[in-house]
A protein has these predicted regions:
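Compact alpha/beta protein-protein interaction domains typified by the UBC
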Residues: 28-98, 107-108, 117
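Conserved beta-strand-loop surface patch within small alpha/beta domains used
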Residues: 567-666, 674-719
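Glycine-rich phosphate-binding loop and adjoining beta1-alpha1-beta2 segment
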Residues: 375-411
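Adenosine-phosphate binding glycine-rich loop
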Residues: 469-565
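Glycine/serine-rich phosphate-binding loop and adjoining beta1-alpha1 elements at the start
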Residues: 142, 152-342
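Domain-scale recognition of soluble eukaryotic interaction modules
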Residues: 3, 75-169
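Glycine-rich adenosine-cofactor-binding loop
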Residues: 335-375
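Phosphate-binding loop/pocket of nucleotide- and phosphate-handling active sites
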Residues: 304-323, 548-602
Length: 719
């Protein structure tokens, strides 16, 4: 028999039936304007002893459309199995795909559709349709409408109706907000039995059907709550919520949230808890009256007659959503709930700092104290996570308000804000107390002065990490202290500079003349770099913060972004040996000491030497010895003397000063003694005098280091 189909897809199904042999056409009908194709699918490969009773040939009805996924109905007595939808009228449809139709549209055709139906039946017969790595099926079908609730614990909630494109949402708002929304009584029932069948049950339409869906008597539990609800009249909530009007209480809506444990097999702990909410009555009064209760003359609820019509009360299903909170945020970001307990102080909420903070806030990670003295200005918005509403506000305070809006202030992870810089004398006690109580300090100031002050004055026993970008915004740098603070930020800063001068690809890392003036002051300049980079690097920072506690090691890390790829440079932080000399603290790289020992040994029996590269910190009287320049080619090396040459030396010093923008420079000389003694000879003292005469012209002390057989000595001469 020839059939003329209205839809192109139906025509293609008929063509593919004969071409594939996957089934036989029974009929094509127009039912209430819908084109219904009835097909006998099969014969199929069904096991002799199937887990579920699937026939070799199954009759299905397909409602065909051209621009959506066709609906496939199976026989009415088909067993309830996973991936089967049971409609309110009892009819059953196959759940063929676990993704939206638009996601498979490009591969979807009539042949693929028919083969998918066969696959569904054959795998269902073997109980293999639901894969082991797939989430368990919900207990009831999904619904479009939803409730968005907090975890306040009250049996009363005020809900505001929000119309979306395809659904209605009821969002919890403040109970005290009597001008908006409606008050609902929210009751809950916990189903003690764990369900293991992994099937979607038919959505109940009445209170009685809801009760029949479980072995436990949830309506009896519901009834026991009536007196408790009525007793609110004896509490302060009666005035807050209902303005002491009994009519308002009686006219409250009633919601019932049911929690069901779902397991894959008998005896296992629940893999997930499924929660479904139902509006079980339009008003509290109509509900308790259906159960036979009335208000007595003593103004109490009393049962005066047997329950009659309560099982026929229509119910409305809702999906349950909880307000965003830190634990939910942690879960959604694949963290563990215990992770968010760390007390962390963040200094600096600028472009990079605000986006790091935003990442951690949205992950529910940490308990934070923010420190920043600056206000938000219009030019900041190019790379700051805040918006126009925050202009003029202190950045730290505005970020706290930002977090409050995400978590509704009930579960905020921003515990304190200090609206001053870390040098503020009036806030020192508060700043030091916050840091001493923290497990980590995150420095995002991009300020050497702040980093040094934190390292030497504030940190105490608290580990610190410093994040900053280079002037062009093409690289992110992380300086991470060791857990015991034996390696601190200041020496990691020196290792960062050394990395720049030793890696030729990084020689232009700090060069930039790209600044834009945002005010008429001489300091009113802001660096120019893409928001894209700040966003990428902030993600690396927040990820690094979450991994810090898993390792005690210190590191210097740099991520360079170029041509849509990232290159990482990583150096393990090293301990700098400390020596006191003439009122100065000498900090010298341990690996550099080893390097000088090696050069001495290689040149024996002669002496050798070179130039010391480092920096001075006059605030803390520290001399950093970071690197050396090897003995120039025209140097004279003898068993009892060393005369350092000068070939190419000045050019090398100028280059490293340019690379590090003056943060490393010439600080003195080193040479070796063939013997174990590192005492200076009279010629060494003359050398030290000449060194100091040269360096004092730049305002620096002169430094001389002598390396012996197994020890070394440092000599410092200043004014």
């Amino acid at each position: 028999m020839d059939y003329t189909c209205k839809t192109a897809f139906a025509t293609n199904i008929l063509k593919n039936l004969s071409a594939t042999g996957l089934g036989k056409l029974v009929s094509v009908q127009d039912i209430d304007g819908a084109e219904v194709i009835t097909i006998d699918i099969g014969p199929m490969e069904i096991p002799q002893y199937p887990v579920y009773l699937v026939k070799t040939i199954e009759r299905v009805n397909i409602i065909s459309v051209d621009d959506d996924l066709p609906v496939v109905y199976c026989r009415d007595d088909f067993p309830i199995v996973p991936h089967l939808n049971v409609l309110p009228d009892g009819r059953k449809t196959l759940c063929l795909f676990d993704v939206p139709f638009n996601d498979i549209r490009y591969t979807f055709n009539a042949s693929m559709f028919l083969r998918r139906i066969v696959y569904w039946f054959e795998q269902t017969a073997r109980a293999q349709l639901h894969q082991a790595d797939q989430p368990l099926e919900p207990y009831f079908p999904g619904t479009c409408d939803g409730l968005i609730l907090s975890d306040s614990g009250y049996p009363f909630v005020r809900l505001k109706r929000i119309k979306t494109l395809n659904s209605i949402l009821y969002k919890e708002i403040a109970l005290e907000n009597i001008t908006e929304g409606r008050v609902y009584i929210l009751l809950s029932a916990v189903i003690k039995k764990n369900y293991t069948k992994n099937i979607i049950n038919r959505m109940p339409q009445t209170l009685g059907e809801l009760d029949d869906a479980f072995e436990e008597n949830i309506l009896k539990e519901l009834e026991t709550r009536f007196s408790e609800i009525w007793a609110v009249k004896q509490t302060s909530l009666y005035k807050t919520i209902f303005q002491e009007k009994e009519t308002e209480l009686r006219n409250s809506g009633v919601l019932l949230a049911i929690r069901i444990g779902l397991s894959r097999s008998e005896g296992e702990e629940p893999e997930r808890y499924y929660i479904k909410a139902f509006q079980v009555s339009d008003t509290f009064q109509s509900l308790y009256q259906a159960f036979g209760y009335h208000r007595s003359k003593k103004n109490k609820l009393e049962k005066v007659k047997p329950a009659e019509d309560y099982k026929n009360i229509s119910i409305i299903p809702f999906e349950m959503f909880y307000q965003f909170n830190s634990q939910f945020a942690t879960f959604l970001n694949e963290g563990t709930i215990t992770e968010h307990n760390d007390n962390i102080v963040q200094i600096g909420l600028g472009a990079l700092g605000s986006q790091i903070a935003n990442n951690c806030i949205r992950a529910g990670y940490g308990n934070w104290t923010y420190i920043d003295p600056d206000a938000l200005y219009p030019h900041n918005l190019a790379r700051h996570c805040l918006n126009q509403d925050s202009i003029g506000q202190n950045k730290a305070q505005a970020m706290q308000q930002y977090a409050n809006l995400l978590f509704h202030g009930k579960d905020n992870i921003i515990k304190a804000v200090i609206s001053s810089d870390i040098f503020s004398k009036s806030e020192q006690e508060k700043i030091r107390a916050s840091i001493s109580e923290a497990t980590l300090v995150v420095d995002c100031t991009a300020s050497v002065a702040a980093e040094r002050y934190l390292s030497h004055e504030l940190a105490g026993k608290t580990r610190s990490v410093s994040f900053f970008m280079n002037p062009t915004g093409t690289a992110l740098i992380m300086l991470l202290e060791s857990a015991d603070r034996s390696i601190t930020l200041d020496v990691l800063e020196m290792q960062y500079y050394r990395l720049l001068i030793r890696e030729k690809k990084l020689w232009h890392h700090l060069k930039s003349d790209r600044k834009v003036l945002y005010s008429s002051t001489c300091r009113g300049a802001s660096l120019v770099y893409p928001q894209d980079n700040a966003s990428i690097f902030s993600g690396l920072c927040s990820s690094a913060i979450k991994q810090i506690f898993s390792s005690p090691n210190a590191t210097v890390s740099m991520w360079v972004y170029d041509d849509l790829s990232i290159t990482r440079y990583k150096k393990i932080g090293e301990i700098f040996q400390e020596i006191n000399c003439n009122g100065w603290k000498i900090k010298i790289s341990s690996s550099l000491i080893t390097q000088m020992y090696d050069q001495r040994r290689n040149k024996l029996p002669n002496e050798t030497g070179g130039v010391l590269i480092g920096a001075y910190d006059y605030e803390h009287n520290i001399c950093y010895i970071v690197d050396i320049i090897d003995s120039p080619s025209d140097s004279e090396e003898y068993p009892n003397a060393y005369v350092r040459g000068h070939n190419g030396l000045l050019k090398q010093i100028e280059r490293l000063e340019e690379i590090t923008i003056g943060n490393l420079t010439y600080i003195g000389e080193w040479h070796s003694h063939p013997t174990a003694s590192t005492q200076p000879s009279k010629y060494d003292l003359i050398l030290l005098k000449s060194i100091s005469d040269y360096t004092l012209a730049q305002g620096n002390p002169g430094c001389m280091l002598i390396v012996g057989d197994s020890n070394f000595s440092v000599y410092l001469q200043s004014i």
